[in-house]
Amino acid sequence: MKVIKRDGSIVDYDRSKISAAIQKANAEVPEEDRLSQDRIDAIIDRIEGLKRPRMLVEDIQDLVEQGLVAENKFHLAKTYIIYRYNRALVRKANTTDESILSLLRNENKELAEENSNKNTMIAATQRDYIAGEVSRDLTRRILLPEYISKAHDEGAIHFHDADYFVQPIFNCCLINIGDMLDNGTVMNGKLIESPKSFQVACTVTTQIIACVASNQYGGQSVDMSHLGKYLRRSREKFRKHISYECAGQVDGATLDRLVDDRVRDELKSGVQTIQYQINTLMTTNGQSPFVTLFLNLREDDPYLEENALIVEEVLRQRLEGIKNEAGVYITPAFPKLVYVLDEHNCLKGGKYDYITELAVRCSAKRMYPDYISAKKMKENYEGNVFSPMGCRSFLSPWKDANGNYQFEGRFNQGVVSLNLPQIGILSRGDEDAFWKLLDQRLQLCFEALMCRHNALKSVRSDSSPIHWQYGAIARLPKGAPIEPLLYGGYSSISLGYIGLYEVTKLMKGVSHTDPQGQDFALRVMDRLRKACDDWKKETNIGFALYGTPAESLCYRFARIDKERFGTIPDITDKGYYTNSYHVDVREHIDAFDKFTFESQFQKISTGGCISYVEIPNMRHNLEALKEVVRFIYNNIQYAEFNTKSDYCQVCGYDGEIIINDDNQWECPACHNMDQTKMNVTRRTCGYLGENYWNVGKTKEIKSRVLHL
């Protein structure tokens, strides 16, 4: 049996601890009120006789109290209760010592593998984790209702980002970068005016990204099309300066060539600034900013030609990669690139197909960019095309006072995720029981999400001036409440879910790709979506359905359920649950069928979704990859390619670092297994990860089959 401690950690059951606690109470009462060792053993035997695989400490103590009362040892029972209360006071005084000290000793494996883009060996990252442990502790003991904390500990739900809940900050956003560049902003009390050149605009953009990232805990996105006007400003400035310097001594063609050369130099330098700054900056969160660059060539854009040059340069530099410490070009994890397919660049003879061809080459080698189909997205979002907030979180359409759609300058309040497989396990194949329990768990999620929402209601704009006062989200006066931005759908708040495949297998005995399973899975998704829609109507808060990325959660839920319910074939035995609505990573299905199947769930999960296919090395078969990109444009809103992009620093091997039978990363050429001497980049959950993963996610990565 396993015991869940109050801090959420899980330890082996030890009956001697129960006996010792009763004996301590025994020593405090007169002889006639004491309990013999035989009767103490009998109480413990009754607890063990329940044969539960997993119990909370509180539940064990409740059973001890009941046992003492049943023995008519009321004085002893009272003394035990007082002892229990005093122990609780000690725990409330400090419950984080061991987790923090184990982190500093580099012995906290769970924390070290929680986020594949955080290196817990680095002092700045450790500081963030130490603060996070304190926040988790305060959240569990004080800030959340006890029943919410208990549901989280039992794996019924996951209250995301408890390590930041103690602070009045939110999840992710679409930075209103156009407004900040055009109208200026303020950082660290210093006025930043509108840039006069592309290079300066790129520098300011990276400064904004860093400042924003340090004041929220989730991802952010920047629409690169706002930089087009600054490239034109640079062109005009160069033309003016060169014309003056040459004093009419060059013809028009030569002047154009000289200007083009200067523009291309600045273009390359500016984009390089963004790429290197993002990959070398470390925010107060102890990591590089989780940022997405949105690459969308809009036909009605007055700076379309400039933006085409910018997008092309971003892709060229990503294709080249960034040098590691050994001087070898590798795949960087950030920034994430999202490239929009539209009629003029969907590989059907459009004007900008050449940029899409470059994007395909880049995806084949560096995994990014991911692809959004403007055609399909317009069908789901009232004719609009806009960036996800970070990885996959999408806003709902919202109109300002003038009736114009607005997406930039909006944000997500937070996420709570539902463990679908656990509901299936508890229902034991009984659909009536399943739907009843699902409704109960949804109510639990709603109440947990309202904790998220209520925590932000008292926030004033002074808490993060870059967000609330200087344009990233709004331009509120100092001291103004942000509460109005929490209502009316301006911001979203997300119900996440994980394990649609597993819950379908539990309830129907088949994958959700099977027709019978698909019908059930769609009904589950519709029920989740209806809950969000109903809550939105009842509260005027922007509830949205979100396919949880589950980088570490895929393992946490599966681990808890295995400990509680034992090994269940094809469910808890794998060591992980499947992300959101995705097809089981082990299931053999081709890329076209996978995208077609998953596209129907994207229409329901509009608060957050992304689909992927695993591909082999396609660098010498780009035509096949182009066919998939054409298919994406016509069939699915948001899609990505997973390939392998690794490097062994010991022998110079450039290919796939494998996961061996011991679940360890190993170079197939020289058998190097030292993770500090290899660069491994994998798709973790929409983002790329490069600092390795927990045991569950590693098993999931190892199990992935090719779809092309």
Q: What positions do the PLM features span?
A:
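Charged, amphipathic alpha-helical regulatory modules used
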Residues: 1-107, 702-707
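Short, solvent-exposed positions on alpha-helices
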Residues: 34, 55-58, 491, 515, ...
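Conserved catalytic cores of very large enzyme subunits
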Residues: 86-90, 96-489, 510, 514-680
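Metallocofactor- and cofactor-centric catalytic cores in central/energy metabolism, strongly enriched
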Residues: 267-271, 275, 505-506, 697-703
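Core of folded catalytic or high-affinity ligand/protein-binding domains
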Residues: 477-478, 485, 489, 495-496, ...
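Contiguous, well-ordered alpha-helical segments that form the cores/surfaces of helical PPI scaffolds
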Residues: 493-506, 526, 683
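Long insertion/accessory domains within large nucleic-acid-processing enzymes
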Residues: 671-708
